[in-house]
């Protein structure tokens, strides 16, 4: 699995005492949804669901490859499931995901996909080649990237998430 990540430790360890963060989490999810970033609260252990990436992987991979990749991703995320830690996950499709284990809980917040780069036709072709995506999926990939929220300034998303974690 080709995944990179950055880890941000939250600035205040009291974020989750007695679920006081719920109002801030709801507010953050509302902001992100207005930015067209899908958000989910799920129970751990983390198990990939095709809705998290808009069906991208399920569409382009056969069932065996899809299962294998999802198992690898689940193991990766479970390794970093720690309180007071935010993961910004960058996958091989140049999609970003925000992952945060909610404190005092077995629940996980995940948001994405979105990107920090604009996608040209050439860039999409490069990503398809890099990920060994058959040519028959070119139109699907063009539509997928056209619909993906793009933020050319990473500080926008990082500020939203860091503000959540400071509460």
Question: For each of these PLM feature ranges, what is it?
Answer:
Residues 11-38, 42-45, 63-167:
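Hydrophobic, helix-rich cores of sensory/ligand-binding and other regulatory modules
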């Amino acid at each position: 699995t080709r995944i990179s990540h950055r880890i941000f430790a939250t600035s205040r360890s009291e974020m989750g005492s007695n679920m006081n963060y719920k109002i801030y989490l709801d507010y953050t999810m509302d902001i992100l949804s207005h930015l067209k970033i899908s958000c989910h609260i799920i129970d751990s252990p983390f198990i990939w669901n095709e809705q998290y990436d808009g069906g991208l992987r399920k569409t382009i991979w056969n069932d065996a490859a899809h299962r294998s990749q999802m198992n690898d991703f689940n193991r990766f995320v479970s390794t970093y499931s720690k309180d007071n830690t935010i993961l910004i996950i960058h996958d091989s499709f140049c999609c970003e995901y925000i992952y945060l284990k909610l404190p005092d809980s077995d629940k996980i917040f995940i948001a994405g996909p979105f990107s920090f780069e604009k996608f040209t036709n050439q860039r999409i072709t490069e990503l398809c080649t890099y990920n060994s995506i058959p040519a028959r999926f070119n139109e699907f990939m063009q539509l997928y990237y056209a619909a993906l929220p793009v933020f050319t300034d990473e500080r926008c998303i990082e500020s939203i998430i860091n503000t959540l974690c400071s509460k």
